[in-house]
């Protein structure tokens, strides 16, 4: 990961930490990775519930971020979830996942890898330059 992408990655991590809605992930390891990064938002896991039920639960929040894995299956899940959630009138954030995919797809396969990537790139770019 290059310095420019590192700065964008840091901005995404900050956004995740500050997010106050619900975040939908695929499983427990995804949630664990986000918690290690300091994410305090409500996290809803897809692993045990049908998509319509997950969307109904998430629709209770003003804003919902979809963070499914960065592969084709994750893309399809994100698309379907967004459709259900928009049907409930939710504000849906799929942009964060798209941004993450653009800058980190070569480095990670899924959300469960975010924390380890964060550690690797933080060490690589330490100490930070002024203004990072």
Curated annotation (Swiss-Prot):
Positions with a binding annotation for Mg(2+) 1: 26, 69
Q: Which CDD domains match?
A: TOPRIM_RNase_M5_like
Q: Which UniProt keywords apply?
A: Magnesium, Metal-binding
Which part of the chain is the Toprim domain?
A: 20-100
Residue ranges that the Swiss-Prot or TrEMBL entry lists as coiled coil: none
**Cofactors required:** Mg(2+)
SUPFAM superfamilies linked: Toprim domain
- List the Pfam families: Toprim (PF01751)
Annotated GO molecular function terms are: metal ion binding
List the disulfide bonds in this chain: none
Residues that hold Mg(2+) 2 according to the record: 69, 71
Question: Which InterPro entries does the entry mention?
Answer: TOPRIM_dom (IPR006171), TOPRIM_RNase_M5-like (IPR034141), UPF0292 (IPR022972)
Q: Which domain of life does the protein's organism represent?
A: Archaea
How many cofactor units bind, and how? Binds two Mg(2+) per subunit.
Gene3D superfamilies from the UniProt entry: 3.40.1360.10
Q: Which family does it belong to?
A: Belongs to the UPF0292 family.
User: What NCBIfam families does the entry give?
Assistant: PRK04017.1-1 (NF003090)
Q: Which PANTHER family match?
A: UPF0292 PROTEIN MJ1624 (PTHR39964:SF2), UPF0292 PROTEIN TK1411 (PTHR39964)
The protein depicted here goes by the name UPF0292 protein PH1700
Origin species:
Pyrococcus horikoshii (strain ATCC 700860 / DSM 12428 / JCM 9974 / NBRC 100139 / OT-3)
